[in-house]
C-alpha cells in the first residue's frame, strides 16, 4: 500500500514499491505470449519479527491492529495462501495485477 499511500519520511520506500508494481505489470505484458504470469501481492502489516523490532510496545501493537477492519494483523499464512492461489490453475487468466492484501484497510 505504500505505493498508493505514501507517508512522511518514506519517499524512497514508497517509490520502490511503485517501481516494483510497474515492473511486474511490464513483465506481465512481455511474458504473456509465453504463458508466464506475473502478479504482485501488496500486503499491509504482516505479523513477523519485523513488527516486533519496530519499537512499539506490546500494547501499542495490539491497539494498532484494531484499526484494521478484520481487527488483526495479517499472518504469513495469509500471504502464502494468496501466493498459492496465484500459482494455481484457478488464477490461470490473472496476470499484471497488483493485489491488495490488507485485512480491509484502505490506507
Predicted regions and their residues:
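Active-site helix of classical SDR
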Residues: 16, 24
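Conserved catalytic loop/helix region of short-chain dehydrogenase/reductase
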Residues: 8-12, 26, 50
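Conserved SDR Rossmann-fold cofactor-binding beta-strand/turn motif
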Residues: 37-47, 87, 100-102
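Alpha-helical segment proximal to the catalytic Tyr-Lys
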Residues: 29-33, 92
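Short C-terminal tail/terminal secondary-structure segment
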Residues: 5, 84, 95-107
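Active-site "substrate specificity/gating" loop of NAD(P)-dependent dehydrogenases
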Residues: 4-10, 32
Amino acid at each position: 500500500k505504500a505505493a498508493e499511500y505514501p507517508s512522511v519520511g518514506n519517499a524512497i520506500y514508497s517509490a520502490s514499491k511503485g517501481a516494483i508494481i510497474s515492473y511486474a505489470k511490464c513483465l506481465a505484458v512481455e511474458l504473456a505470449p509465453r504463458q508466464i504470469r506475473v502478479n504482485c501481492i501488496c500486503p499491509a502489516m504482516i505479523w513477523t519479527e519485523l513488527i516486533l523490532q519496530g519499537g512499539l510496545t506490546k500494547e501499542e501493537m495490539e491497539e494498532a491492529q484494531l484499526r484494521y477492519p478484520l481487527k488483526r494483523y495479517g499472518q504469513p499464512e495469509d500471504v502464502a495462501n494468496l501466493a498459492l492461489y496465484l500459482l494455481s490453475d484457478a488464477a490461470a487468466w490473472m496476470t499484471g495485477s497488483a493485489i491488495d492484501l490488507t485485512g480491509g484497510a484502505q490506507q
